[in-house]
Amino acid sequence: INGMQVEFKFEDDEHDAEKSVNAYNSLKDWGMQVLAGPVTTTPTLAVAAESVNDNMFVLTPSASAQTVIETGDNVFQICFTDPNQGVASADYIAENALATKIGVIYDSSDAYSSGIYAKFKTEAETKGLEIVTAEAFTSDNKSDLSTQVAKCQEAGAELVFLPIYYTEASQI
């Protein structure tokens, strides 16, 4: 790039805080000078805390928690934040009159999911939307969400808001 030799090396953080720090340290030992990643919030927060000590430039393309860039002056994020997603989702539902009774299924053990849900809840209330039920799951019990779906149906939800990753959403 511009006459400079660039070498890329990849490590998989498996969306796990401890594994992401191990991957970061492995890349640092290899000689990394710039980190492009991690891509999700939980690993990024863990790596960002480590990178401050090293003053390593970190650029995450898609970690969306607002706290990501609060870690240090060396950490940058490209995409929109969780609060923006929650607000925009509630605004869209209200402005397009998609529903007034909303069920929510979210991952209470995940900063991304919880962050979007928290802001969605606040904005939904200001828009006159009623959250009839909010059903949580955790990373330990995310393989079957049929109970959460049934509770949304029982509560009379006209729409179910899913601030979750596609793997979990694909089960619904």
Regions flagged by a language model, labelled:
Residues 47, 120, 172:
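Aromatic/hydrophobic pocket-lining residues that form π-stacking "cages" and hydrophobic walls in ligand
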Residues 36, 159-163:
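Structural motif
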Residues 1-2, 93:
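Flexible, small-residue-rich helix->loop connector segments that border functional cores
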Residues 21, 28, 94-95, 153:
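Non-catalytic positions within long, well-ordered alpha-helices that form the structural scaffold/packing
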Residues 31-33, 99, 156-158:
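Short, high-confidence coil segments that cap the C-terminus of an alpha-helix
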Residues 75-140, 159:
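An alpha-beta-alpha
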